């Protein structure tokens, strides 16, 4: 299995990255330092995670120590929904760049297709608890993303949480300069995303799987929610390979030719999550894992369900 996947502009993207969603600011610096020391080269960030400054401290330290060269790192961040207005994209990008203490990013994604009302709140809500949308169209936002590439600020651009119809709208944009190179989506055995992945691959778009372990530390977890890590069927498959359940859950997307970004701030787990290139899950076990799909989402973003660009209504 490849340790890198080639993007549609020839850039190579490491198959395994460190996720930083929900990594507490006080722990994420150490987590990123440990990850780089262990051999991680791909770090997945976002402005809305509110910890990019701390990630930047770790990156700077490792670059200064010459543990790694900048060109060997693959740093990803994402444009938040309150900055979809074309005039706001560059400012949001520059904030991320300065927080991460970098001169350029390797990949910048539109985090969600849904534009929100600009302002200090990341989730501006009305009295009924619904997100207040902005009067923006992500196709226009894409034009501003393309300008970042032209200015040499980012090597590659892509999307996240977009459905095929939404990607199609970008691909059909008049005067399109750069196709989305990546679509980052939630993906694990309870949400296998076969149709969406098949669509993306048919368009030469690499898919990154987030929440590969089902995001067990999500704040809104309910006791009755299914747990991938505790699923006895997945535990049994892992035992067969003398691997942990997490390692099988990380290996699963890799064998589907996806990029995967498990999050951890625990050094032992960060190391364990990297040890997924020395075994192969059989095609029978892969088919079994795929059969566990139940279209169960960790990240359904229900506060946006009434938004015109909410991505999860149509399973197309």
UniProtKB/Swiss-Prot annotation:
The record marks 78 as: Lowers pKa of active site Tyr. NADP(+) binds at residues 10-19, 211-273. InterPro entries: AKR, Aldo/ket_reductase_CS, NADP_OxRdtase_dom, NADP_OxRdtase_dom_sf. The keyword S-adenosyl-L-methionine does not apply. GO terms for cellular component: cytosol; nucleoplasm. It comes from the Eukaryota. It holds the Pfam family Aldo_ket_red. The modification N6-acetyllysine is found at residues 95, 222, 263. The active site is at 49 (proton donor). GO terms for molecular function: aldose reductase (NADPH) activity; all-trans-retinol dehydrogenase (NADP+) activity; allyl-alcohol dehydrogenase activity; glyceraldehyde oxidoreductase activity; glycerol dehydrogenase (NADP+) activity; L-glucuronate reductase activity; prostaglandin H2 endoperoxidase reductase activity; retinal dehydrogenase activity. Substrate binds at residue 111. The modification Phosphoserine is found at residue 3. It is an enzyme of class 1 (oxidoreductase). Abundant in the testis, skeletal muscle and kidney. The modification N-acetylalanine is found at residue 2. Its EC number is 1.1.1.21, 1.1.1.300, 1.1.1.372, 1.1.1.54. It is found in: Cytoplasm. GO terms for biological process: cellular hyperosmotic salinity response; daunorubicin metabolic process; doxorubicin metabolic process; epithelial cell maturation; fructose biosynthetic process; L-ascorbic acid biosynthetic process; metanephric collecting duct development; negative regulation of apoptotic process. Belongs to the aldo/keto reductase family. Monomer. This is Aldo-keto reductase family 1 member B1. The gene is Akr1b1.
């Amino acid at each position: 299995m490849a340790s890198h996947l080639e993007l549609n502009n020839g850039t190579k993207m490491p198959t395994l990255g460190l996720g930083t969603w929900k990594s507490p600011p006080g722990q994420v610096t150490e987590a990123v330092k440990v990850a780089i020391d262990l051999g991680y080269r791909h770090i997945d960030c976002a402005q809305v995670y509110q910890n990019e400054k701390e990630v930047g401290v770790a990156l700077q330290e490792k670059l200064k120590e010459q543990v790694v060269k900048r060109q060997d790192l693959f740093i990803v961040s994402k444009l938040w929904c309150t900055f979809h207005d074309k005039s706001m994209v560059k400012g949001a990008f520059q904030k991320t760049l300065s927080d991460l203490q970098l001169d350029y990013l390797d990949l910048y994604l539109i985090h969600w297709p849904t534009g929100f009302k600009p302002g200090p709140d990341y989730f501006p809500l009305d009295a009924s608890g619904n997100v207040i949308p902005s009067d923006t169209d992500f196709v226009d936002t894409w034009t501003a993303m393309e300008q970042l590439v032209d200015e040499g600020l980012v090597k590659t651009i892509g999307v996240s949480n977009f459905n095929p119809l939404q990607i199609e709208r970008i691909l059909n944009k008049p005067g399109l300069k750069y196709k989305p190179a990546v679509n980052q989506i939630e993906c694990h055995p309870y949400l296998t995303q076969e149709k969406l992945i098949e669509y993306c691959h048919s368009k030469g778009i690499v898919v990154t799987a987030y929440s590969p372990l089902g995001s067990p530390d999500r704040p809104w977890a309910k006791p009755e929610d299914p747990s991938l890590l505790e699923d006895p069927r997945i535990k049994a498959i892992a035992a067969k390979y003398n691997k942990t359940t997490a390692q099988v859950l990380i290996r699963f997307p890799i064998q589907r030719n996806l990029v995967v970004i498990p999050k951890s701030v625990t050094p032992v787990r960060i190391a364990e999550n990297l040890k997924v290139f020395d075994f192969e899950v059989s095609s029978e076990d892969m088919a079994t894992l795929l059969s566990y799909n139940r279209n169960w989402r960790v990240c359904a973003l229900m506060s946006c369900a009434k938004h015109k660009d909410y991505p999860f209504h149509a399973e197309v």
